[in-house]
């Protein structure tokens, strides 16, 4: 009898071992060669594409989300919603049975509900909220939309219903809720970490309802995500998602060619022909809803002078930059809105390249003998700027022709963003990819007074006539009126020149042939839930 039991036990152990080995062998892993390290894992606080790709996209959901690869909004954590006749009350009916992830610090005891929605927004809205100041508490997207003023209350009707009351109708409100700062965090996890005395863990060890959970992060090296088996839309096709942090585009390509990673962002334009010739690579592309620009700090001399800003704009040989830096992957920009965004004013006339006129303007501004300026260049490739260092050097050479001495400055990406937000720069290469497709998502975060203090307004431009236009457009339900107001805003920006609009680019993404289901995101994010790999 003992022998029989032992034999059965041994056979069972062998079967379990075989199954374990089999599952290990068949586990599907996709490696994404990302361009940089996230600042942290809370998209309410850190909004760069690099941070959002590592937080909002894999870990979290929102009440509404965009259909992958499109600009079409669809229900997500909210199954449906009702809007009052006066346009000021939104009632969201929440999806039932949605599970939160867990980690070594926390195991959820309940499903997603209205408390999580209220926590996620009130943390950003209420200065007295216990989490408001955690992790430095800078909610630039929330504040740039003036959501603190717009939302008068968020009420729990019941566990599966939440009501937002607004001070006035807001045309892009639903679209804004699909923006990544509106990701839904776990209130229960937050309460647990607050009691443990480690509230910042919520932002560094995230727990969401999304398709992947964060398993490991080695700064500047690697991020490991594992598929969340209880994801409400069904488990992802891949088991592991690895971000191999690789700042150099040439190194990213070398890894892709050796199948050390299967997807890479922001290729060097010069490498595109090589990728097209490689039978193992599928070079995907889509028109990007983005704009690369040079922001002038309008609160610092000498760029606080509009004539100086206009002169510096006229001195930039934009066509030469498009040819040398973008190499066929970009078109010259003359206003903030790219052609794919409604109300973009194609009739607006760009500043001509005119060094002599620029010199005359500098003289009028009191700088007949020229001036010295710092010119900041971002250290990473972005969808709207494949080579900021090269672009800065070309602008530096252009400005030298009108007597302007520019010193090119750069920092590590997180430090660069931090310093630009605090206004240390005079002129900085920046850019934007819309998160919603609405014109307000360009004007509001980037150039309104509200976003000038610690927000995404890198020009630190606060111009009341412009602010009034944007507010009027945002609160109007008349589409044609909004179009007219946004066109007026584009002309006003052209005249005041808080930033030189340089380029709109096409997004190119090389993907290994082993990968299926990948879609280029028009908003510039990298989404892997729907992806499979052989």
Spans of features found by a protein language model:
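Detector for C-terminal structural segments
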Residues: 28-34, 51-54, 171, 218-221, ...
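Aromatic- and charge-enriched surface segment that lines or borders ligand/interaction sites
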Residues: 79-130, 163, 255, 302
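Ligand-site clamp/hinge motif
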Residues: 200-203, 228-274, 392
């Amino acid at each position: 009898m003992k022998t029989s039991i032992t034999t059965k036990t041994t056979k069972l152990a062998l079967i379990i071992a075989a199954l374990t080995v089999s599952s290990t062998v068949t586990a599907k892993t996709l490696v994404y060669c990302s361009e940089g390290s996230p600042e942290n894992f809370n998209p309410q606080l850190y909004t760069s594409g690099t941070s959002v790709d590592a937080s909002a996209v894999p870990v979290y959901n929102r009440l509404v989300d965009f259909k992958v690869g499109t600009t079409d909004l669809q229900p997500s954590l909210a199954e449906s919603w009702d809007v009052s006749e006066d346009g000021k009350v939104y009632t969201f009916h929440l999806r039932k049975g949605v599970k939160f992830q867990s980690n070594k610090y926390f195991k959820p005891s309940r499903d997603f509900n209205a408390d999580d929605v209220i926590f996620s927004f009130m943390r950003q809205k209420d200065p007295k909220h216990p989490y408001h100041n955690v992790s430095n508490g800078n909610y630039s997207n929330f504040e740039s939309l003036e959501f603190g003023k717009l939302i008068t209350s968020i009420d729990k009707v019941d566990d599966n219903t939440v009501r937002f009351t607004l001070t006035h109708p807001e045309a892009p409100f639903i679209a804004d809720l699909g923006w990544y700062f509106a990701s839904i965090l776990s209130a229960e996890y937050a309460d647990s970490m607050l009691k443990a005395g480690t509230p910042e863990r919520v932002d560094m060890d995230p727990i969401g309802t999304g398709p992947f959970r964060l398993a490991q992060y080695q700064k500047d090296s690697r991020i490991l995500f594992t598929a969340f088996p209880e994801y409400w839309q069904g488990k992802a096709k891949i088991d592991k998602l690895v971000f191999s942090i690789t700042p150099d585009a040439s190194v990213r390509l070398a890894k892709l060619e050796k199948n050390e990673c299967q997807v890479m962002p922001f290729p060097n334009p010069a490498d595109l022909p090589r990728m097209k010739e490689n039978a193992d690579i599928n070079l995907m592309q889509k028109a990007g809803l983005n704009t690369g620009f040079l922001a002038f700090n309008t609160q610092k001399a000498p760029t606080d002078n509009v004539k100086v800003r206009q002169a510096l704009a006229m001195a930039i040989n934009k066509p030469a930059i498009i040819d040398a830096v973008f190499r066929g992957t970009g078109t010259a920009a003359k206003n903030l809105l790219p052609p794919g965004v409604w109300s973009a004013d194609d009739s607006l006339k760009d500043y001509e390249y005119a060094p002599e006129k620029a010199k005359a303007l500098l003289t009028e501004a009191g700088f007949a003998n020229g001036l010295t300026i710092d010119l900041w260049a971002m250290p990473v490739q972005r969808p709207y700027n494949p080579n900021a260092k090269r672009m800065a050097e070309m602008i530096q050479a252009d400005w030298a022709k009108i007597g302007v001495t520019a010193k090119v400055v750069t920092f590590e990406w997180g430090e660069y963003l931090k310093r630009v937000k605090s206004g240390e720069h005079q002129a900085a290469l920046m850019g934007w990819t819309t998160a919603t497709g609405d014109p307000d998502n360009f004007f509001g975060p980037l150039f309104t007074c509200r976003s000038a203090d610690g927000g995404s307004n890198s020009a630190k431009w606060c111009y009341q006539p412009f602010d009034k236009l944007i507010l009027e457009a945002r609160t109007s339900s008349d589409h044609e009126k909004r179009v007219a107001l946004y066109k007026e805003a584009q002309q006003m920006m052209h005249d005041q020149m808080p930033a030189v609009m340089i380029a709109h680019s096409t997004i190119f993404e090389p993907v290994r042939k082993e990968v299926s289901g990948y879609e280029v995101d028009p908003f510039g994010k990298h989404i892997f839930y729907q992806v499979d790999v052989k």
